[in-house]
UniProtKB/Swiss-Prot annotation:
Reported cofactor(s): pyruvate
InterPro entries the record matches: AdoMetDC_fam_prok, S-AdoMet_deCO2ase_core, S-AdoMet_deCOase_pro-enz
Signal sequence range: none
Stated name of the protein: S-adenosylmethionine decarboxylase proenzyme
GO CC, any one term: cytosol
Assembly and binders: Heterotetramer of two alpha and two beta chains arranged as a dimer of alpha/beta heterodimers.
Listed GO MF terms: adenosylmethionine decarboxylase activity
Record's keyword annotation contains S-adenosyl-L-methionine: yes
Lineage per the UniProt record: Bacteria, Pseudomonadati, Aquificota, Aquificia, Aquificales
Cofactor note: Binds 1 pyruvoyl group covalently per subunit.
Length: 133
């Protein structure tokens, strides 16, 4: 039996309104809103304003990270959401971003990361047998 340690969503968003992705304050608010909406835990963040247009930013999470890089002059934003906090939280963070940015087109890749074996817990009988050997 195996389990996946994390889920990674890479999304290219096209047809995003210029004003939604041009300013670093809006980009910061977007990612922080996604973190809160998904119930993720922020460790730190870094954001940068480009001139004449665009912004980039990343929030480091206890569960991994969420990032954005924008080209508002092309109506384009590259989004990266990777968490080990459960698939639901990863999808919720992306759902929030899509609701706010309302892209006309989305190209998305979803990857399960870190598939590892799951060891079953020994039953009570197996524990007794191991202790008496």
């Amino acid at each position: 039996m195996e389990k996946t340690l994390g889920l990674h969503i890479l999304a290219d968003l096209y047809g995003v309104e210029f004003d939604k992705i041009d300013h670093v304050e809006d980009v910061r608010e977007l990612l922080e809103g996604a973190v809160k909406y998904a119930g993720l835990s922020k460790l730190s963040s870094h954001f940068h304003q480009f001139y004449p247009h665009g912004a980039t930013g990343v929030i480091l999470l206890e569960e991994s990270h969420i990032s954005i890089h924008t080209w508002p002059e092309h109506g384009y934003a590259a989004i990266d959401v990777y968490t080990c906090g459960g698939k639901e939280k990863t999808f919720k963070a992306m759902e929030y971003i899509l609701k706010v940015l309302k892209p006309k087109r989305i190209d998305e890749k979803v990857a399960e990361r870190g598939t590892v074996p799951v060891h079953k817990e020994a039953t009570h009988i197996e524990k007794i047998e191991l202790e008496t050997v």
